[in-house]
Amino acid sequence: MKLTIATRKSKLAQVQTELIINVLKDKYGISSEKLLMETLGDKILDKSLADIGGKGLFIKDIERILLEDKADAAVHSMKDVPFEVPDMFEIAAVTLRVDVRDVFVSRDGTHFKDLKNGAVIGTSSNRRAAQLKMLRDDIKVVPIRGNVQTRIRKMGEEKLDGIILAAAGLKRLNMENIITDYFSVEEMIPAVGQGALGVEIKKENKNRDLFRKLDNKNSRMCVEAERSFMRTLNGDCHSTIGAYAEIVNGQMNVLGFYEIDGRRVKKDVSGNIEDYMSLGKTLAEKILEDK
């Protein structure tokens, strides 16, 4: 048996898919090949993601391939997966999460705290831009789209003082050496699902049980708590929303960030792990009540 795993064409997407392929081979002796896709979100880089499709922009084209049985599964960054997965699909596995933090990459090595007044930082994430303003109101934020390598190139070409990226992606690309500063999860609450990979399949997939074996229970619960938070706020991966759930001593702690009507609100809740879905919802309601 040889499986076909669909993913985006970017180097990071391929590296992430190879992680899944290697587990399938090493643990279960099953070979797989990649099917590379260029999604609409990859093709159009001169517009914001919100302007060209909104929810699920990086996912829909790949789901079509699954529907046509041209691939057995797809690997996504969980932060790109909308909270509503179409009925014919399921996220069979959420992998063990890696570093969830956002990082600052400086063009000239200057640390974030030492940036000059009015420094220009690139990010197309509303979530990152809003939290940057909470840390340093003087900073000017400009949009920057593309894969990791493209953003780094644009930083130099456009003479930006720095850019904000996800630690997980840089580490998976073995590019940790370019990181200037790490933001704590309190300073910059991550995107929902950041640092975790998701394996998506058709529900009637004959290899469903195999793919489900790749699931990490704790990562799944944390990511689902965050997605419950996003669902309650009716957000997507372009909304000004961040959430981070972690399990500490048998308890789940959830941090949430939301910008509403120009106000930026951060809150947290804690509770039993078994209540992970309701914790995300409770946190969202707590934020909405903060008027």
UniProtKB/Swiss-Prot annotation:
Keywords: Porphyrin biosynthesis, Transferase. The keyword Transferase applies. Binds 1 dipyrromethane group covalently. The modification S-(dipyrrolylmethanemethyl)cysteine is found at residue 237. InterPro entries: HemC (IPR000860), Porphobilin_deaminase_N (IPR022417), Porphobilinogen_deaminase_C (IPR022418), Porphobilinogen_deaminase_C_sf (IPR036803). Pathway: Porphyrin-containing compound metabolism; protoporphyrin-IX biosynthesis; coproporphyrinogen-III from 5-aminolevulinate: step 2/4. It catalyses: 4 porphobilinogen + H2O = hydroxymethylbilane + 4 NH4(+). It comes from the Bacteria. GO terms for biological process: protoporphyrinogen IX biosynthetic process. It holds the Pfam family Porphobil_deam. One of its GO terms (molecular function) is hydroxymethylbilane synthase activity. Its EC number is 2.5.1.61. Gene3D superfamilies: Periplasmic binding protein-like II (3.40.190.10), Porphobilinogen deaminase, C-terminal domain (3.30.160.40). Transmembrane segments: none annotated. Its cofactor is dipyrromethane. The keyword Transferase applies. GO terms for cellular component: cytoplasm. Tetrapolymerization of the monopyrrole PBG into the hydroxymethylbilane pre-uroporphyrinogen in several discrete steps. Monomer. The porphobilinogen subunits are added to the dipyrromethane group. Belongs to the HMBS family. This is Porphobilinogen deaminase. It comes from Clostridium acetobutylicum (strain ATCC 824 / DSM 792 / JCM 1419 / IAM 19013 / LMG 5710 / NBRC 13948 / NRRL B-527 / VKM B-1787 / 2291 / W). The lineage of its organism: Bacteria, Bacillati, Bacillota, Clostridia, Eubacteriales.
